[in-house]
Amino acid sequence: MKNIIYITIFLLTLTAITYSQSVMEFEAGSALTIDSGADISADEIIMNGTYTGGGTINGNSAYVLNLTVLIEGFYNSSTDTMVGDTVRVYLRNLSSPYAIVDSSACYLSSSGIGTLIFSNAFNGTNYYLDIRHRNSIETWSAAGQSFTSFFGTYDFSNANSQAYGNNMAQVNTSPVKFALFSGDVNQDGFVELSDVVLIYNDASNFVTGYANTDVNGDNLIDLSDLLITYNNSSAFVSKVTP
């Protein structure tokens, strides 16, 4: 059970407190005062008021990653913008078997910018960033990304070398931009005939709305989605990972 301590401005003097499988919640008051040398320990601490004193409060910290990722089919080179959508990012160890350390999802803006929050990372430790999108090729960062003072930044869009194996599509020349390959509708790591067939079937049935077969994000499954996927299938696009 996750331990959460809610602290909402309550006047109290503590010598030491550690909660296990419980919640400590204070609803009213003015401040939390901790005696010198006292400790508060929990898995998560949410502070809405203030505290003073010489002790420590220990809880899991939030690690913030500012990410920039473009999606090939969703990107419009004439406006240098894209249709916003959700991606999930996995933090992975740098060494085989590249175990997943944590994951977080965010909504990418029209500029491809999103903010992710992780709780199981560590400052100064390098992690691969494994990007997943509903109909794009799984793409990893070229090298390890670390957090400094709980913050990190990574931009996949400014160079092909930002992706492991240089595995992205160039979607603009001025400014130079790169994006995740689109068309992996069934998320098997390949853009191939099976993806084309899925799109063809949905297009034939006039499917609309938020669907994996909508490769360009316009909420219509039609020829434009087929063309993007067919071209990447013909180029044998697939995921490239360590």
Regions found by a protein language model. Give the residues of each.
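Short coil-to-beta strand junction motifs in C2/discoidin
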Residues: 79-88, 124
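Structured interaction patches on ligand/partner-binding surfaces of diverse proteins
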Residues: 107-108, 136-170
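Alpha-helical segments with a strong preference for the paired helices of cellulosomal dockerin domains
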Residues: 165-171, 185-212, 216-242
